[in-house]
Amino acid sequence: MAAAAASHLNLDALREVLECPICMESFTEEQLRPKLLHCGHTICRQCLEKLLASSINGVRCPFCSKITRITSLTQLTDNLTVLKIIDTAGLSEAVGLLMCRSCGRRLPRQFCRSCGLVLCEPCREADHQPPGHCTLPVKEAAEERRRDFGEKLTRLRELMGELQRRKAALEGVSKDLQARYKAVLQEYGHEERRVQDELARSRKFFTGSLAEVEKSNSQVVEEQSYLLNIAEVQAVSRCDYFLAKIKQADVALLEETADEEEPELTASLPRELTLQDVELLKVGHVGPLQIGQAVKKPRTVNVEDSWAMEATASAASTSVTFREMDMSPEEVVASPRASPAKQRGPEAASNIQQCLFLKKMGAKGSTPGMFNLPVSLYVTSQGEVLVADRGNYRIQVFTRKGFLKEIRRSPSGIDSFVLSFLGADLPNLTPLSVAMNCQGLIGVTDSYDNSLKVYTLDGHCVACHRSQLSKPWGITALPSGQFVVTDVEGGKLWCFTVDRGSGVVKYSCLCSAVRPKFVTCDAEGTVYFTQGLGLNLENRQNEHHLEGGFSIGSVGPDGQLGRQISHFFSENEDFRCIAGMCVDARGDLIVADSSRKEILHFPKGGGYSVLIREGLTCPVGIALTPKGQLLVLDCWDHCIKIYSYHLRRYSTP
């Protein structure tokens, strides 16, 4: 296990292991003691104290944003591996594992295929001579093994492509089934509504018949009630008559005749009533009512059919061209969404530079001047604007007069002919970053094949470089005409010298860094780059091109590290997701944080201020025009927002 670890050991890897990724200071056994979070990342104790002081329920890891719920640093364990590497004796032992497996004193140059050992030249000549042993240089053996792995990787990628096609076909089948389910359910609903209409008509007829019976019976009952009331009145009248007789004198009562007949009051009342009785006679269904039944029948679907693939349609919008505006300060009107920067914290400048909103250029679409998820922005010294339009697979070039042209991948050669003949899709240009040097060459990092491509302004590709690049991302142009490219997975910054006729003529490693991504440079050739992976917490579509860094480093043209801006650039402020940078004429650094949705300003002399804090959705690129206007590329708004930027002196803390 130690030998396997030592095979990948180098000075850059040791520096990455022995430095805190936040403050970029080397770990020590005291104040900068390495502490291990629950997610597995290592941070020094000093940075953890700041993280713990600025949170309530724990520490949020700047790498993966997972929360380690602790109340004290004593609850975290030390990274014993890092502490062991700090020991000089242990480090010497690890370096010794990189030597010849036979003598252990010299660097290996040969590889014995028979024994599986890396050997130095004297050991090979002494003990590993043919025919008993087959030896070859280490580089050739490694390249041979890489080719074997590459063939296996190619087969696996073909298999992955086939699996993706089958998954897409299966998704199409699933959507078709869902549509069929919905259609059958709608048909059932129509039939159910028809039955409900029939039931409503039946209920109306039934209630009408019941109302007729109720009316007839009511008439009989009312007539009988009328006769009873008359008889009751007659009875009351007779009662009053007899009461009066009872009160008469004896002589008068006896003198009246007593043979008066008593009237029959109930003679007119009927003895029987003829009414209509009702009852419910059930007709039709004997069992429960059923509208219909779902009938199943077998259906065979070929998952390799092309009909199962989901087709996408893009809506075209009106074209909007970019035109740089010439406006006086009196004509500038601030947008209600873009307010001047306010002071934030005790470290903010007292006289803060104001950036007023001027205009928004472009919208979502595929026509010239429109954008679809733009990810990179670059402005040349002549005022030309280059935009990496990732969603439309192109680079758009604008001049001060408006849209100039677009650059796409123009396939040529026998491979493209074969792909076209077979009906396969041609490779696209998937730009991640773009820049133009002083020679008029346009450098683009392409995520389609993880390469650096260099184009002329006419769209002709003069170079395509993949060697030494694992995942190229950011690119910038030095004043000398060289391109600097960041390799996120390789952890290096590469410097390329490109010739218009010969392509890439020279390349070298400028420096190493922790997952460098976005890059820019000033007029003196100092390169600024982001480090680490800060996740945008509002990345709703899981788009990895919207993830940025959480600290900034710099390196000179000679490879010497310079100014560093750590994760905590202020006492109470930190980076969340750096997605773009640029440098103004004074050497001040301007940073776009897509998670904070703000544009930050870091003067060369120190301090910071917030230039723009409102009106941005997801800023991913910024650049300054020669006329002093600040261009902000808003990815989720699919446009360029233009602000005023005045170069004036002000004091910083």
From Swiss-Prot:
Signal sequence region: none
A biological-process GO annotation: positive regulation of cell motility
Subcellular location: Cytoplasm; Mitochondrion; Endoplasmic reticulum
GO molecular function terms listed in the Swiss-Prot or TrEMBL record: identical protein binding; myosin binding; protein-macromolecule adaptor activity; RNA binding; Tat protein binding; transcription coactivator activity; translation initiation factor binding; ubiquitin binding
SMART domains for the chain: BBOX, RING
ZnF segments: RING-type: 20-65
Zinc finger (B box-type): 103-133
Chain positions found as N-acetylalanine: A2
Domain of life: Eukaryota
Tissue-by-tissue expression: Spleen, thymus, prostate, testis, ovary, intestine, colon and skeletal muscle.
Disease entry from the Swiss-Prot or TrEMBL record: Muscular dystrophy, limb-girdle, autosomal recessive 8: An autosomal recessive degenerative myopathy characterized by pelvic girdle, shoulder girdle and quadriceps muscle weakness. Clinical phenotype and severity are highly variable. Disease progression is slow and most patients remain ambulatory into the sixth decade of life.
UniProt xrefs under PANTHER family: E3 UBIQUITIN-PROTEIN LIGASE TRIM32, TRIPARTITE MOTIF-CONTAINING PROTEIN 2-LIKE PROTEIN
Subunit structure: It self-associates. Interacts with DTNBP1. Interacts with PIAS4/PIASY upon treatment with UVB and TNF-alpha. Interacts with AMBRA1; promoting activation of ULK1 through unanchored 'Lys-63'-linked polyubiquitin chains. Interacts with TICAM1 and TAX1BP1; these interactions target TICAM1 to TAX1BP1-mediated selective autophagic degradation.
Function of the protein: E3 ubiquitin ligase that plays a role in various biological processes including neural stem cell differentiation, innate immunity, inflammatory resonse and autophagy. Plays a role in virus-triggered induction of IFN-beta and TNF-alpha by mediating the ubiquitination of STING1. Mechanistically, targets STING1 for 'Lys-63'-linked ubiquitination which promotes the interaction of STING1 with TBK1. Regulates bacterial clearance and promotes autophagy in Mycobacterium tuberculosis-infected macrophages.
Protein name: E3 ubiquitin-protein ligase TRIM32
Species this protein is from: Homo sapiens (Human)
